[in-house]
């Protein structure tokens, strides 16, 4: 047990240790694999604890400085968990489809966010009623689309300082954009992933809801604690 209350028993219970089928492995994950059981790779939870602690320390210290975080997880097992934990920790999030250029084409995304704000303002005063039926319908459809894909980053005013990625394989486009821009990443890496592509790889089962939730809670709690520490510091 350590300062972030990361213990092996909890990780076992959440199924964090279960990797993919051995035949699907990435050899770069060898240092993080404990064994093979019935054709399934078993993740070394000591390594998971080590990197999760490192990630929590980084997030805590970064949150103290008031930095911005983005959580990306669009697979069905993760989508609602991403939204829930991100809102609790006041992080930005993407839990639907990742739109290419969300980070690398930030100027265009900012314009879309402005459009989202304009349409929501219009909706709040029943402004759609002023338009012909067909035009109002188009505007409502546009608003629904913008909310769906950009709702989680509506308050993002600049590129994030750190991006947390739930499934490296599933979110490869997002990861590549971070690499291009030099944005640090923390990634869940299952046994079929490439740990070299991320700044802090967390070896873990990225398919189990319990595993995703357990690790996400640790990461976002460290952000919340960092922000609380910052507030207390400014009061003293």
Swiss-Prot record:
GO terms for biological process: translation. One of its GO terms (cellular component) is mitochondrial small ribosomal subunit. Transmembrane segments: none annotated. Pfam families: Ribosomal_S2 (PF00318). Keywords: Chloroplast, Plastid, Ribonucleoprotein, Ribosomal protein. It is found in: Plastid, Chloroplast. It comes from the Eukaryota. InterPro entries: Ribosomal_uS2 (IPR001865), Ribosomal_uS2_bac/mit/plastid (IPR005706), Ribosomal_uS2_CS (IPR018130), Ribosomal_uS2_flav_dom_sf (IPR023591). CDD domains: RPS2. GO terms for molecular function: structural constituent of ribosome. Belongs to the universal ribosomal protein uS2 family. HAMAP family: Ribosomal_uS2_B (MF_00291_B). This is Small ribosomal subunit protein uS2c. The gene is rps2.
């Amino acid at each position: 047990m350590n300062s972030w209350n990361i213990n092996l028993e909890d990780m076992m219970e959440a199924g964090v240790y279960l990797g993919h089928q051995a035949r699907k492995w990435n050899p770069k994950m060898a240092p993080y694999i404990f064994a093979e059981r019935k054709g399934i790779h078993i993740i070394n939870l000591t390594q998971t604890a080590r990197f999760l602690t490192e990630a929590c320390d980084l997030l805590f210290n970064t949150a103290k400085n008031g930095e911005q975080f983005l959580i990306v997880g669009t697979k069905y097992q993760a989508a609602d968990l991403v939204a829930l934990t991100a809102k609790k920790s006041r992080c930005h999030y993407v839990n639907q489809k990742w739109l290419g250029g969300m980070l690398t084409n930030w100027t265009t995304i900012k314009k879309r966010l402005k459009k989202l704000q304009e349409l929501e303002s219009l909706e709040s005063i029943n402004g759609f009623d002023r338009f012909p039926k067909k035009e109002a319908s188009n505007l409502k459809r546009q608003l629904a689309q913008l909310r769906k894909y950009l709702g989680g980053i509506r308050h993002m005013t600049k590129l994030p300082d750190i991006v947390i990625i739930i499934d490296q394989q599933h979110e490869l486009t997002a990861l590549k954009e971070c690499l291009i821009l030099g944005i640090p990443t923390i990634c869940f890496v299952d046994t079929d992933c490439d740990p070299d592509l991320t700044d802090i790889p967390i070896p873990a089962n990225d398919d189990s809801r319990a595993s995703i939730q357990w690790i996400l809670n640790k990461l976002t709690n460290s952000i919340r604690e960092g922000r609380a520490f910052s507030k207390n510091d400014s009061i003293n």
